[in-house]
Amino acid sequence: PLRPDSVYTAGERFGTIGAIFGPYRVEITTYRGEWYSPDSRKPEVTFGISLEEDLSRRDFTVNAIAMDIPSGRLIDPFGGVEDLHSKVIRAVGDPDARFRDDPLRLMRAVRFAANLGFRIEPRTAEAIRRHAAQICKISVERVRDELTRMLTGPAPDVAIAALVDLGLMQYIVPEVVELKQVSTGGGKHKDIFIHTLKVVRNTPPDLVIR
């Protein structure tokens, strides 16, 4: 049998242990889900009883696909493979419930869509708008990490525009939203916001520069 070089158990109370096989790090997790109570920034973890129940708690259909390793058979109860082919970001089941479970998913939807060149399907997009203020429940460190992945990704301008359009940016960096109200005073661009998007698009993927 394959034996790991080392095992770490830092996430054991959340149902996760890790194993390292040479250069590869593998996380082994039991069936579980996470949700945020209205007055807390820390997630509550609940353990499930079946694979389908576990997949039903995932954020988007493209992330709710499993594989039976011995046979190679895909387990795809929510149409994730079809959405992958169609380049669609779609919440699993009820989008309102998915974003209540973990409001960071509001930003993850934007990041996946921008970085992968996908589109957010309408019901999911409308739910993001409804729950945008809930991003304030998430720790600043997690919000920072998501924003960093967008800014250093292949389409930071698309990500920024989507954050503004979906109502998230006003809770993250509200000064960016205010750029839409500033004119360049007869320059080439309609407003400073459009100019900023063009600049970000054409700079190297360095966080300090972008």
Regions found by a protein language model. Give the residues of each.
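Catalytic cores of the polymerase beta-like nucleotidyltransferase superfamily
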Residues: 1-210
